[in-house]
Amino acid sequence: SEKKGIGKMEHCKIIAVGDNVCDKYLSRGKMYPGGQCVNTCVYVKMNNMESAYLGKYGDDEVAACVQDTLKEIGIDDSHCRRYEGENGFALVTLKETDRVFLGSNKGGIAKEHDFGFTKEDLEYIKGFHLFTQI
């Protein structure tokens, strides 16, 4: 008989708490969402497991890009904080096939606000098998 616990990996639920950004590719005029926590959630979901993201968003088009992408992929971000101001971003260009980072806004609004976890947040987090914070 199977031991109690996580069981098969496809039933594993992971929540990542922390950063989200968009890389703004100046050479292409496009934005691509990312950040270690968002990337972790996406890779988990790509492997047919459940993932959720808990972080801080600004109220600009960069935040909308991340939120829309997570929604499209099916990653829950319902417990994220939303603040007035710029979401985190990095400015990127390409030199031949290499990415060159030109600068960033150092996380935008995320650096200005603590998480201030609520009891509801903590209960929500308890529903996951793995918690990662970056």
What spans do the regions from the language model cover?
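Conserved N-terminal subdomain of the carbohydrate kinase-like
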Residues: 22-24, 50-130
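Structural motif
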Residues: 15-17, 129-132
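Glycine-rich phosphate/adenosyl-contacting loop at the front of the ribokinase-like
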Residues: 5-75
